[in-house]
Every structure is written in structure tokens, then in C-alpha cells.
Design a protein with these regions (language model features):
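N-terminal secretory signal peptides that target proteins for export/translocation
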Residues: 1-2
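Bacterial N-terminal signal peptides
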Residues: 6-17
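Sec/Tat signal peptide C-region and signal peptidase I cleavage site
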Residues: 17-23
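Extended repeat-based scaffolds of very large eukaryotic assembly and lipid-transport proteins
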Residues: 23-208
């Protein structure tokens, strides 16, 4: 039985590995196309990039957005490749060095001089836009702080695309206080963006 299970898992890993590679390749193409705006953008220019990344819709995209928002991403100056810095130090000549890996695939890229890479530092306006794009992911997180952040972000700028993930979050929420806040946000979101007249009417009456 154990041997059979091992064989199944081995076959499954072989079948899914190419799919992951294809997914990474497709996502990297999106990032390469938008590299300049990712490296330096404003709240006025970042929207199209976020829409394209968000529409990709996988955990890969969500992890990238989280890293971008938290200023955890860097890029290699000569190639514009987006990376993460795993550790820092100094070489034998006393020069600052960084140990880096690819931001999407986690491929280890070795050691570079610190001056060869640059941190991506989105300003507060861009980070707010990224947070809004992350709302569905944050609301579905197992971490209550993530869910609170998702709700806070949503409450500042409720969009029609937030209705479905908010509804799902309400059904799954275990914290009563947070669930009440979600329900209140859903009522206002339904009034603002709802397309079903009965749901809008029920939302209005629930305020009385």
C-alpha cells in the first residue's frame, strides 16, 4: 500500500512539474513586459500592471504582489530581472554582497555585488493599489491579521469585484467581531455595486 501511494505521488509530481514550469514562464513574461513600471511606478500608472497580474489569478501572482507591497523585491540592474535578496554580507575585499534568488521561481542565482542590484520601493499610493488588488487573497487567508487588513483595504475603496470574495469570507469567518464587520461592509458593497434588485433592497432594509 505504501509502495503504491509513493508511486502515485511520484507520477503526480512528474505530471504537475511541467504545468508549474509553464505557469511560471507565462507569469515571468507578464513581469518582463511590465518590468519598467514595476520597478518604478505611481498610483496613476500602476493600475494596468496590477490588472494584468491580478487577472493571472494564481497563488504565484498573489505571492508576487505581497512581496512587491512589502518592499521585498529587487532587480538586477543590467538585466532588469526581478529577484529576492536571501542574505547579505561582505566579500574578501570588504565589498557588500548579496545572495539572490528569482522572485518567481525561487531559483538560486548565486552571489552578486550589492551595487549590482536595486530595491523596488513602491510609494504609499502604489502600495494601497496593490493592497486593493490583494483583497480576495487576504480575505481568504488563515491569518486573522491578513483578513483584517483585507477588510480595512476593501472598506476604503469597495469595488464590485470584492463582492464575491467578501461573501465567501463571511461564510468562512470564525471570529464574530470580524464577521460582523464583514457583513456590514457587504451590505454597503451590495448597495453600491449590487446588480440583483432583491439583494440591494434587502441590503437597504437591513440598515433600518
Amino acid at each position: 500500500m505504501i509502495r503504491l501511494l509513493f508511486s502515485f505521488l511520484l507520477v503526480l509530481s512528474v505530471l504537475t512539474a511541467p504545468q508549474r514550469a509553464i505557469a511560471s514562464s507565462e507569469f515571468i513574461e507578464i513581469l518582463n513586459k511590465n518590468a519598467a513600471l514595476i520597478q518604478k511606478s505611481s498610483s496613476k500608472t500602476v493600475a494596468p500592471v496590477l490588472e494584468e497580474i491580478q487577472s493571472y489569478g494564481t497563488r504565484l501572482a498573489a505571492d508576487f504582489l505581497i512581496g512587491w507591497k512589502n518592499k521585498e523585491l529587487f532587480f538586477i540592474k543590467e538585466s532588469s530581472r526581478i529577484i529576492r535578496v536571501d542574505s547579505t554580507g561582505k566579500n574578501e575585499d570588504g565589498k557588500k554582497i548579496v545572495n539572490i534568488s528569482d522572485a518567481v521561481t525561487d531559483e538560486k542565482l548565486g552571489i552578486r555585488l550589492s551595487k549590482d542590484v536595486k530595491q523596488i520601493k513602491p510609494n504609499s499610493g502604489v502600495r494601497a493599489k496593490i493592497a486593493s488588488a490583494l483583497v480576495p487573497v487576504l480575505l481568504a487567508s488563515e491569518d486573522i491579521q491578513d483578513r483584517q487588513e483585507g477588510l480595512d483595504t476593501l472598506s476604503r475603496d469597495i469595488k464590485s469585484s470584492h463582492l464575491e470574495p467578501l461573501k465567501n469570507a463571511i461564510a468562512a469567518e470564525r471570529n464574530e467581531d470580524l464577521k460582523t464587520r464583514m457583513e456590514q461592509a457587504y451590505i454597503y458593497a451590495s448597495i453600491t455595486h449590487g446588480e440583483n434588485e432583491d439583494e440591494i433592497e434587502n441590503a437597504i432594509f437591513s440598515l433600518r
